[in-house]
């Protein structure tokens, strides 16, 4: 439990429910694993030998590879850009490493000092095996020390997936450290936890609470889970091979899985203040892991926010549609927009609302939830989804309250 009770442990009932589902889904998935092993044992245990890191993992063309030791833990990061510029801290997701931001580092470094971190347990950072070393309070304190060690008092945090969850928590726990938060393919932690039952990998999230077996399962069929998550990369792609190299040992999975073994048991205290700094939520319109409904609900925890949708992207919009993503990112972080009508940026929101309501109309089961959010944010003015003039409600998805 983090100090000041901003990040708290979930209720006893939630803990019991998670452990119960862990047993149920754990037994089910292990039975499936056993059946696959019996049917084709050679394919099940196939694991290509990978002793040499691909050049892209050690290449310095994207920036300098650096290390810092915090509380006895070594962190690896890649830094690019002038030290006189504002700092942008990039936090990757799962299963990934600093290389996740290969398309963003060159672009951002023209305007910022960029640090792409290997989270603890990932990449070339240390990989302690103990689950307790991945408690949220320890992770956040290490991120706090990292930012301070870089010689700044605050920075912009851009996080994807797990990195986004950590960014949300950092903005709540240490608001003085975060100038702006960009959460990519990642709803607010409270929304993430409450919407897990609708997630396509719900069973897997419960299964990974077990010890040892999830690590073994991740290695089967030559680290097939990497290909599953990184479907946007073709077979034998250089970057796909780099990810498989980074996750080719059992100990390479213990740390990453320990994040899930801890994050499912925490939430932001309901009496905490909403996040005061600007928040940009970016998601792909084809993401199967994160629902659009969850992104919209996450704005309840923000005073100032923008919601941006990357067309044609799934869970990795910063890689799959990196040009469109970079344009959104730079526009949010660098370019000054004209503000009209009491601080509401209408023009930037028009495309979002069109796609938002388009998504709602084609996905009926989420319509009521999005409508409830619209109703709430307009203080009851909007009671139903209109069939015409949808753009007149653009401001509710791009709020810059003073």
Regions of interest found by a model, annotated:
Residues 106, 117-120:
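N-terminal cap/lid subdomain of alpha/beta-hydrolase-fold enzymes
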Residues 103-112, 149:
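A short, Lys/Arg-enriched amphipathic alpha-helix followed by its capping loop at the start of a domain
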Residues 93, 320-321:
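Active-site helix-initiating loop/hinge in glycosyltransferases
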Residues 100, 119-122:
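Recognition helices and adjacent regulatory flanks at domain boundaries
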Residues 84-85, 95-103, 114:
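Serine-hydrolase catalytic-loop signature spanning alpha/beta hydrolases and amidase-signature enzymes
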Residues 2-66, 72-88, 115, 122-158, ...:
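Flexible "cap/lid" subdomain of the alpha/beta-hydrolase fold that forms the substrate-access gate
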Residues 99-102, 168-172, 326:
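Short, hydrophobic alpha-helix immediately C-terminal to the catalytic nucleophile
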